[in-house]
Amino acid sequence: MQHEKALVVFSGGQDSTTCLFWAKQQFSHVEAVTFAYGQRHDAEIEVAKEIAAELDVPHHILDLSLLGQLTSNALTRHDLDIDNADVPNTFVDGRNHLFLSFAAVMAKQLGMHHIVTGVCETDFSGYPDCRDQFIKSLNVTLNLAMDYPFVIDTPLMWLDKKETWALADELGAFDYVKERTLTCYNGVIGSGCGECPACKLRQNGLTAYEEVRV
């Protein structure tokens, strides 16, 4: 893959930033795309901008604010409290489907075949569009829809959060990911608020990894 180019679906969070570091080692040229979909915190987009600039990665921002007109969830609605149901109310219907579809359109225009996303089935938090089955199905659909050989790369698919921290460390990005990324649903950079489901998952993985880190 060293002579190929890739587009990373990028939010500025732990997972997508780890994927960005991974992609920079795997591909000859990497760009990133971030989607503005009416998320609770503009900070997510600002963090993504800053990280892309610091890593010298060309960065695109696409407006998908129409998602807020179609679905009600705790990631786009400030008046909804975050819950932990079987499918949490932080799940945005169609989000990864749309993100990857728009990323594919952009990738084709840029002459790229690889699309990198940080979805993960091991710690998928009840989100159906993070499952390997969905990604493989969408990959086939996109190839047929655009008659173009896309490859959706999912380097975190079978890693839990402990293993994701280990990968960041292998990539030389452990401290950067720990201090600079925004995973928190409440918009707190780095270690986060410590209370939301995303922060708890991130911290549990970090604690588990630091216990065995050499």
Curated annotation (Swiss-Prot):
Catalytically driven reaction(s): 7-carboxy-7-deazaguanine + NH4(+) + ATP = 7-cyano-7-deazaguanine + ADP + phosphate + H2O + H(+)
Domain of life: Bacteria
Listed cofactors: Zn(2+)
Sequence positions that bind ATP: F10, S11, G12, G13, Q14, D15, S16, T17, T18, C19, L20
Pathway(s) served: Purine metabolism; 7-cyano-7-deazaguanine biosynthesis
GO molecular function: ATP binding; ligase activity, forming carbon-nitrogen bonds; zinc ion binding
Keyword annotations: ATP-binding, Ligase, Metal-binding, Nucleotide-binding, Queuosine biosynthesis, Zinc
Residues the record lists as binding Zn(2+): C184, C193, C196, C199
InterPro entries associated with the record: QueC, Rossmann-like_a/b/a_fold
Binding note for cofactor: Binds 1 zinc ion per subunit.
GO biological process, one term: queuosine biosynthetic process
Biological role: Catalyzes the ATP-dependent conversion of 7-carboxy-7-deazaguanine (CDG) to 7-cyano-7-deazaguanine (preQ(0)).
NCBIfam families cross-referenced by the UniProt entry: 7-cyano-7-deazaguanine synthase QueC
Descriptive protein name: 7-cyano-7-deazaguanine synthase
